[in-house]
Swiss-Prot record:
Protein name in the entry: Uncharacterized oxidoreductase C663.06c
Gene Ontology molecular functions: oxidoreductase activity
Gene Ontology CC terms: cytoplasm; cytosol; nucleus
Originating organism: Schizosaccharomyces pombe (strain 972 / ATCC 24843) (Fission yeast)
UniProt similarity note: Belongs to the short-chain dehydrogenases/reductases (SDR) family.
UniProt binding sites for NADP(+): I17, S36, D62, N89, Y158, K162, V191, T193
Location of the protein in the cell: Cytoplasm; Nucleus
SUPFAM superfamilies named among the record's database cross-references: NAD(P)-binding Rossmann-fold domains
Active site: Y158 (proton donor), K162 (lowers pka of active site tyr)
EC number assigned by the record: 1.-.-.-
């Protein structure tokens, strides 16, 4: 496999926004995409896509496990020896209760997957990204994790985990600022995915108007992916540490 290609690793590339990223990137000339799935055998749509796109390679990865992240990185290292763009898109979203009524297991599961998970991927893939030409690391975050643009719905564990992820991104951007890296978080917008629909249904009990807003304004995953890629394609060194919206504007922390 040629190392002159631009190499992308998409953690969580098996469905929704991640799969849309994989599809758009794999249609680009000179691009190789490694897409992770926790259970590759169950990622049927990604499997089908890879059969018709020889530049797509599926990697097993459970981001909650540092061992799994290290194994995934070793597999990519053997194949291509570098990563130009590391995009951590994996995460969970099933926390819709008040802080008062959110149990420990919900807090713990969101922190483990949405914060420690991306940290595991970063720790495992850092040497590969350092060898890449672009040296870009992207964390898919959420407006819900912004305290400056507070989202007025009960998000408890999810919102807290995304705020922690944004802090982690900012810390990494500071640590790598002298190594030529560009590290950002990005909000994909309100996207028509299964997890987003579940969240809307939960919040509709208290605010029924959200159903109409979601129906009219939610982006298709392909549109969100396309918009975010425009942002990432045009990143400059001075963007290191930014929290972007999918449309290229910035979001306060």
């Amino acid at each position: 496999m040629s190392t002159t290609n631009k190499i992308y690793f998409i953690a969580g590339g098996n469905r929704g926004i991640g799969l849309s990223l994989v599809k758009e990137l794999s249609n680009r000339e000179g691009t190789v995409v490694f897409a992770s799935a926790r259970k590759p055998e169950a990622a049927t749509e990604l499997q089908e896509w890879s059969k018709s796109h020889s530049n797509v390679h599926i990697i097993k990865l459970d981001i909650s496990s540092l061992e799994s992240a290290n194994e995934a990185a070793q597999e990519v290292a053997k194949a291509v020896g570098k990563v130009d763009v590391l995009w951590v898109n994996s995460g969970i979203f099933h926390s819709f209760n008040t802080v008062l009524n959110t149990p420990d297991d919900v807090w713990n599961s969101h922190y483990k997957t949405n914060v420690l998970g991306p940290i595991h991927v970063y720790q495992a893939f850092y040497p590969l990204v350092k060898k890449g030409e672009s040296k870009i690391i992207v964390f898919t975050s959420s407006l819900v994790g912004s305290m400056g643009a507070f989202f007025p719905f009960n998000q408890s564990g999810y919102g807290q985990s995304k705020a922690a992820l944004n802090f982690t991104m900012k810390e990494i951007s500071f640590e790598l600022q002298d190594e030529g890296f560009i590290v950002i978080s990005i909000h994909p917008g309100m996207v028509r995915t299964d997890s987003a629909q579940e969240a809307v249904n939960q919040h509709a009990e208290a605010k029924p108007e959200i159903l109409d807003i979601f129906a009219k304004q939610a982006l298709a995953p392909d549109q969100s992916a396309s918009d975010m890629l425009k942002v990432v394609d045009n990143l400059k060194p001075e963007n290191n540490g930014f929290f972007f919206n999918y449309d290229g504007t910035t979001i306060p922390y």
